[in-house]
Every structure is written in C-alpha cells, then in structure tokens.
Amino acid sequence: MNSIEISTEIAKIKYWHHHFDFGDGIETKQGKEGKFCRKFQQWILSGIPEDLTDKTVLDIGAWDGFYSFSAEKRGAKRVLATDSFIWQQQELYGLDHNFWRDFGAGKQGFELARKIYNSQVEDYNIDVLELDKDKIGTFDIVLFLGVLYHMKYPLFALEKVRSVTKELLVLETHISLFFSLFPQPLMQFYPSNELSKDVTNWTGANIALVKSWLLTAGFRKAELVKWRKDRAIFHAWC
Ligand SMILES: C[S@@+](CC[C@H](N)C(=O)[O-])C[C@H]1O[C@@H](n2cnc3c(N)ncnc32)[C@H](O)[C@@H]1O
C-alpha cells in the first residue's frame, strides 16, 4: 500500500483505540486525544521488557493490537493477539441500543494495522474466561493490559491467564486510589457506570489486592513495577 492508500483506509475507520504512527506523517489520531493516547501507550510500553527476542507473546484484549505489533518489533518469534468483546461489536451493529456501534469500534483497526505493517501477528477471538492451553498453547510472556477491571470474576480470569503463561505476566490495570492508601487487600465495586461512565467496568482493586490475586492465581511472585494516578503495571512470574 502506498501512503495515499494507507491514509484513505485509516480515515475510513471511525474509531481507533490506539494511536499508531505509521511514518511519513501518517497517524491514526490528531490533536489532544492523539497526544494523550501516545503518552499513555509509551508509559505502558515502558513496563514491557525491551528485548523479546525468541519469546512467544500472548496479548489478551488486544483491540487495535498496538502492543502485539510492538512485541513483534521487539523480536518476539510468535505473537498471538486475542480479544472478544470489542472484536465482536461489528457483528452486533444491527442490534438496537448498541453503545459501541455509534463509536464504530471493532476489529477493523487491528486488521488494517496488521496489513500496513505486513505483520505476522496471529489473531484469535476468545473470551478471557475461555482461555485454555489446549486451544491456544502457552506463552513465555503474556500481556494483560487494561482488561482486569472489565472482569466480573477477576480472580477466575487471572487463573485462566496463569494457565497460559510460562514465564512472565505483564498486567496493567485501573486501581482504586483511595483503597491503595491501605495495606490490606481491598476493592471498590462498580455495579453500574461509576468508572468512566462505562458499564463494562466492574472493579477497582487496590495494589495489595492485585498482588494477592496474582499469587492466589498461581504466580510465584508479583511486583508493582509502575504506578501513575489510578493506573498500575505489575509483573508476575511463574
Ligand atoms: C480498555 S481496552 C484495553 C485494550 C488494550 N489491551 C490496551 O491496553 O490498550 C479493554 C479490552 O479488553 C477486551 N475485553 C473485555 N472483556 C473481555 C473478555 N471477557 N474477553 C476478552 N477480551 C475482553 C475489550 O474488548 C478491549 O479490547
């Protein structure tokens, strides 16, 4: 694809979750929001190991796939991007009251970015709670970024994540700032749209609870590696 074709295809996609800079001045977003996404993505990226040479990487809840493509660029020999909720939204566009339809959210961004990068990243539509090593195998490094607080059953979800992790889990999540003042494992529950007006957000764990969940789910060691406002990055080792 030449630059004009790339720009045309990018413009056809109504909503990009990730900011991509494809070079030659071609970006997926402009202005303030683009700048925020870029900064946030760089912050998350800085919590992922720089060298992924010869590693297998699973990106759970990949959406547009920015972190999957980044893992490939960092030398990973195999990258599998999985998602379900947002990748299925296009199929649900016909339904009434589909909040995401108006956004235009779906899998289009992932597919176009993969084409532009000529990437070998694989994709698989699977719910977190269906993750199973017999279906997808196990991976040296697993990325679970921005997904945990969308889980109604967070500990069960982490057990599923643990079952497909061989070496290291990189977890990024929303945390409750208030409850993180306490050393005990505590959680805020969002029964409706209290967090960011999004009804798919359920939990705001504190730092201690995320670590406890990781150990309970079967990881040998769990550490907080970065913390900014109400977002935190943890590493957990098998
Ligand atoms: C806030 S986005 C995070 C996207 C990306 N990982 C990032 O950090 O930018 C949450 C993602 O989790 C996915 N997701 C939510 N619930 C899921 C589920 N039950 N199974 C699989 N993916 C899910 C959504 O479709 C969406 O892509």
Task: Annotate the PLM regions.
Residues 64-76:
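Conserved SAM-binding loop of SAM-dependent methyltransferases across substrates and taxa
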Residues 1-27:
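N-terminal, positively charged/glycine-rich alpha-helical extensions of SAM-dependent methyltransferases
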Residues 88-114:
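Glycine-rich phosphate-binding loop and adjoining beta1-alpha1-beta2 segment
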Residues 78-84:
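Conserved SAM-binding motif I beta-strand of class I
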Residues 55-63:
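Conserved class I S-adenosyl-L-methionine
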Residues 118-129:
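Conserved SAM-binding strand-loop segment of SAM-dependent methyltransferases
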Residues 32-53, 70:
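Conserved alpha-helix/loop element of class I SAM-dependent methyltransferases that forms part
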Residues 129-135, 139, 143-144, 152-238:
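S-adenosyl-L-methionine-dependent methyltransferase catalytic module, highlighting the catalytic core
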